[in-house]
Amino acid sequence: MATRTGVVCSAHGQSFVKVSQVVTSIPPSYLAQFREPVGYLDFARFGPPAHAVVELTARLAERAMTAGPSTVDDLMRQEARAEAAAARLCGAGAGNVVLLPNTSTGLFGVALGLAGEVAVSPAEFPANTYPWVRAGRARVRWLRPGPVTPESVRDALSDEVTAVSVSAVDFHTGYRADLAALREVVGDRLLVVDGIQGFGVLDEPWSAADVVVVGGQKWLRAGWSTGFAALSDRALDRLSPVLSGWTGVVDPGVFDGAPHPVAPGAAAWSVTNPNPIAAGALATALELVESAGVPALHERIVERSDELAEAVRSAGGTVAAPWARRAGILSFTLPGVPAQVVGRALARAGVTATARSGRVRLSPHASTKAEAVALVAAALRPLRG
């Protein structure tokens, strides 16, 4: 479990906790939930789910297979369970959370509902650029290339900018955005955060954002087609729920042939009934995160990342931008050795990693064992120039 101390900070009417000290340990019961291979270091791409997630998914699917009079209603209760767990972890009210099948759906919902201009980096993962370009409602103001810092955002702001969209963690370099500082710079504008590369393993002030959109298939280890969005009251007031369906209204079960008023809260962003099996998987994964504690998970991940970075440097590699504020992503190059060659060498050694855009990306989780570091070191050693 994890215990923490901190102080309550506020910015532009919003309060959030800034952690000042964390004392951590991970329960063995949490670690026993996972059985990925020792060399699996690709959680930034996909996180193999826990035993509890797989088992619940199977149980719910079996219930659906033998459906009776109350089965559908019983299965649909997983939605409220998942929304409540997500709300607890991001510091939102349960009425401010809506389930989604993926991050892109949530970002498209925001893009379709926003007027004015949105500031976003062209270096973002495409899930955080295409919605703004395709929706065509808000004009796009591109930030200068490089990490999305408070300074780069401040330089791009104008009266026309109504929102800033940023990833909590850069998918390519592992740069971790300073959400609290961005909140200060953005002011009364909406701060939209793609949290897929950090939620559940970073102890961030998520409530500093107006919109947090998270897919559950990576660090949350909930499997595909899982996710949620948390929207502040300000976001709900300013964004139009354009991407909203029959379940996003008052009395959705009353079929009277007339359009109904928009539902209160984040429920207005509902398009249709969620997959209850996916909702159950997400709820279980989120509750497992709660059982271990986000600070404990983050501390273990940073420790393993440090060990991997040392193995890379010992082999003559260069770690891309060793940020002081780190998440779980470690990108590197080996001088004179193409990234694809390094990736194949790692694969032969039993290491699962991503080789892309001239770099190799390693991304361990709290369940990653020390033996993984030895596998990486052994794979890189013969490649030294």
Model-derived features: positions:
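Pyridoxal 5′-phosphate
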Residues: V8-G385
